UniProtKB/Swiss-Prot annotation:
GO terms for biological process: defense response to bacterium. Shows weak antimicrobial activity against its phylogenetic relative Caulobacter crescentus. Does not show activity against other bacteria tested (E.coli, Vibrio sp, Burkhoderia thailandensis, and Salmonella newport). Highly thermostable. One of its GO terms (cellular component) is extracellular region. This is Astexin-3. The keyword Secreted applies. The keyword Chaperone does not apply. Residues 1-25 form a propeptide. It comes from the Bacteria. This lasso peptide is hydrolyzed to a linear form by the isopeptidase AtxE2, in vitro. The isopeptidase AtxE2 only recognizes the threaded form (but not the unthreaded form). It is found in: Cytoplasm; Secreted.
């Protein structure tokens, strides 16, 4: 379990999640925005590693 967004401010995390998720998984921007806890990245984002 990685806390990727822990190193980023909450607002910056939201922005990054929205942009990156939109580019990588177009139909799921809300999922990334909703999972600010980082669980989404831990399971679905290789770049978090």
């Amino acid at each position: 379990m990685r806390t990727y967004n822990r190193s980023l401010p909450a607002r910056a995390g939201l922005t990054d999640l929205g942009k990156v998720t939109t580019h990588t998984k177009g139909p799921t921007p809300m999922v990334g925005l909703d999972s600010v806890s980082g669980q989404y990245w831990d399971q679905h984002a290789p770049l978090a590693d």
